[in-house]
Each structure stands twice: as structure tokens, then as C-alpha cells.
Amino acid sequence: MLIPWEVWRDNLIQDAPESVARSIWEQLSPEPNQVNLDKLDLKRYYSLAIPKSFIYCRQDEAMGSGYFHPRMSSRLGAFDLLEMDGSHEVMFTRPRELADKLIEASSD
């Protein structure tokens, strides 16, 4: 499955200049959709007594508003919420800010 250009541009990397978004999109490789459908048993993961952090990118519209936070983040139990501006693809559009948030998340 390859993400159509319009979906990529409008929902996943809308904070990048169009030339950057297109350059990255042209390098994407199709991947099987089955990985998105497989059910995983995560009971053991959720029961781990480790610190958990969630980096919430405020403009992430990949799955619609609220999908990642609070819907997915609420599964973590107690966690630190770290927020930043950016789309789903902040590793391309805001790498320095993302690196800072990862360091902050690891500081528990």
C-alpha cells in the first residue's frame, strides 16, 4: 500500500513546504497493510513497571483528531505527556525539537 500524495501532504506532513513533502513522498516504499490489521497481545507490555512518556504532536491529523491522544495514549496507564507542534512526520519537519522531546522523555 502506498499512501496517495494528497493524503500524505494534507494529513501526514502538512507542516512541511510542498517541495520537502514531495521529495520525502517520492522516497516512500509501499508496505503491506496487514501490519495495521494484525492483533497483538500487549497485556505484558502494558503491565511493565517502567516509566512511560507520550509525545503528542498537536497538528498530527494522520488518523483524525484525538486518535493518538487521548485514544491511544490512554492505554499506557500513568504516563508523562510531552507536547510539541508538528505533524505526524516531525522527524522530517522538526527533527531538533523531536530530539529534545525524546531526551526529555528519557529523563525520568
Label the predicted regions.
Residues M1-Y46:
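Helix-rich cap/lid subdomain of alpha/beta-hydrolase
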Residues K43-A49, S74-L76:
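Short, conserved loop/helix-junction motifs that constitute active-site signature segments
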Residues S47-L48, F54-Y56:
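Short beta-strand/loop motif that positions the catalytic acidic residue
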Residues L48, A105-D108:
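Glycine-rich phosphate-binding loop signature in dinucleotide/nucleotide-binding domains
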Residues R58-D85, F92, E104-S106:
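Conserved loop-alpha-helix segment in the C-terminal half of the alpha/beta-hydrolase fold
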Residues P95-I103:
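Short, amphipathic alpha-helical "lid/cap" segments that border enzyme active or binding sites
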